[in-house]
């Protein structure tokens, strides 16, 4: 990674204005159901406190549409942060985001203390990246730290705009994400295998196109595999399919051949007569999918083939489930991929789980800690895999 990080700053007596990603899931009572994103920010916050800084944290939560909404207040996050960060001398919260009240709260901060600003999306200027809001935020710190990889693909006032008004560096989480995903894409240990799943090919065209020039093998699963099977002239019954994307699938298969990348499709599938955990189900070869049935998972021969590819790889990136993993009978393929990746990692391969549903699948399987890296950013991971420059990263100072 060619950007400055928090290690490049002398923090003694400085105020660190840190964009974190505290966009955590809440239940109906406003209780946090998964604090992974809060925990992911702790190494950066701890480092800053240990090195004599006071820390001002900003984040969005949910989609409050540019106005205050108690449902999306960061109050529960502050309470959880207080529990997770006993070494902070104090964790304070302000109802303000910018302006005199926020500036007064920051002026009271002493080294070793933490202040959490209210949800940045309560301000209608946040998402349009209004320079006036960015300049107001910049008054709250001496150095801007971006540790919110999950929003690095969005040019908001608190992720990109503020970096034009303060020295800007990456936090440890941002650095880790860019080092793992960027390293795998730009300088992979080979064989380099990617596993791409999920429902729609249209969501992942850019990813597949970018990867075809880099990978040794691309393993396709999930609903998008049906569109590839249809493009090969196979009948997919009542399966989820995108007829409009058939020409794209044909182009991608041709491009894979041109570039010497092996694009592997399922050879057998688990089909059901309804979209339900209680449906009748059977395993068939992809050439034998009957009318009225739908593909809901990859089959055992495909699992064996894909698992062997993963275990033989030195770098693996996975994005998207292999089937309808939220229905227990159709989670087998997705779990098997997670297991094969854990085995590859145990043998010294770099294994990266790239955001979204794959992360949930790996966590459900209890294998998250067996991976080299589990990404915290769904959309941001996808854009990196597409080869795009992330605005929140581009705005940081280059390493010298």
From Swiss-Prot:
Per the record's keyword annotation, is tRNA processing included, yes or no?
Answer: no
The protein's matches in CDD domains, at most eight in alphabetical order, are given as:
Phosphoglycerate_kinase (cd00318)
List, alphabetically, the GO terms of the cellular component aspect: cytosol
Annotated ATP binding lies at 204, 326, 355-358
Where is this gene product found?
Cytoplasm
The EC number(s) given in the record are 2.7.2.3
Signal peptide location: none
Q: Which reaction does it catalyse?
A: (2R)-3-phosphoglycerate + ATP = (2R)-3-phospho-glyceroyl phosphate + ADP
- From its record, what is one biological process in GO terms? gluconeogenesis
Q: List the Gene3D superfamilies hit by this protein, alphabetically.
A: Phosphoglycerate kinase, N-terminal domain
Could you tell me which pathway this protein works in?
Carbohydrate degradation; glycolysis; pyruvate from D-glyceraldehyde 3-phosphate: step 2/5
Q: What class of enzyme is it?
A: transferase
Keyword Oxidoreductase set for record: no
Under the subunit heading, UniProt states: Monomer.
PANTHER family hit by this protein = PHOSPHOGLYCERATE KINASE, PHOSPHOGLYCERATE KINASE 1, CHLOROPLASTIC-RELATED
Family, per entry: Belongs to the phosphoglycerate kinase family.
Tell me what this protein is called.
Phosphoglycerate kinase
- Please give the organism: Chloroflexus aurantiacus (strain ATCC 29366 / DSM 635 / J-10-fl)
Question: What lineage, starting at the top, does this entry show?
Answer: Bacteria, Bacillati, Chloroflexota, Chloroflexia, Chloroflexales
Question: What would be the name of the gene that encodes this protein?
Answer: pgk
């Amino acid at each position: 990674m060619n950007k400055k990080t928090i290690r490049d700053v002398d923090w003694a007596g400085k105020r660190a204005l840190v964009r974190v990603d505290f966009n955590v899931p809440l239940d109906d009572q406003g209780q946090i159901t998964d604090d992974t994103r809060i925990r992911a920010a702790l190494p950066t916050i701890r480092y800053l406190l240990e090195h004599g800084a006071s820390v001002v944290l900003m984040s969005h939560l949910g989609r409050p549409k540019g106005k205050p909404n108690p449902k999306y207040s960061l109050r529960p996050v502050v309470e959880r942060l207080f529990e997770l960060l006993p070494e902070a001398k104090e964790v304070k919260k302000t109802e303000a985001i910018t302006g005199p009240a926020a500036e007064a709260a920051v002026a009271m901060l002493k080294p070793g203390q933490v202040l959490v600003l209210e949800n940045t999306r309560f301000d209608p200027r946040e998402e349009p990246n209004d320079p006036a809001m960015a300049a107001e935020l910049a008054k709250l710190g001496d150095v801007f730290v971006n540790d919110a990889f999950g929003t690095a693909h969005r040019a908001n006032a608190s992720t990109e705009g503020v970096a034009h008004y303060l020295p800007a560096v990456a936090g440890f989480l941002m650095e880790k994400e860019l080092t793992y995903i960027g390293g795998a894409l730009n300088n992979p240990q080979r064989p380099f295998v990617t596993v791409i799943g999920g429902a729609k090919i249209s969501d992942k065209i850019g990813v597949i196109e970018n990867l075809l020039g880099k990978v040794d093998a691309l393993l396709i699963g999930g609903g998008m595999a049906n569109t590839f099977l249809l493009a090969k002239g196979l009948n997919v019954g009542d399966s989820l399919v995108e007829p409009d994307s058939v020409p794209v699938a044909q182009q991608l298969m041709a491009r894979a051949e041109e570039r010497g990348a092996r694009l592997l499709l399922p050879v057998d599938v688990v089909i059901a007569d309804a979209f339900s955990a209680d449906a009748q189900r059977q395993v068939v070869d992809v050439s034998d999918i009957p009318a009225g049935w739908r593909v809901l998972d990859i089959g055992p021969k495909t699992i064996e083939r894909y698992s062997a590819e993963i275990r033989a790889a030195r770098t693996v990136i996975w994005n998207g489930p292999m089937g309808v993993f939220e229905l227990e009978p159709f989670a087998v393929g997705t779990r098997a991929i997670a297991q094969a990746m854990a085995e590859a990692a145990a043998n010294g391969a770099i294994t990266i789980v790239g955001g979204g549903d794959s992360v949930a699948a790996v966590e459900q399987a209890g294998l998250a800690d067996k991976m080299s890296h589990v990404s915290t950013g769904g959309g941001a991971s996808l854009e990196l895999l597409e080869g795009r420059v992330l605005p929140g990263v581009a705005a940081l100072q280059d390493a010298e």
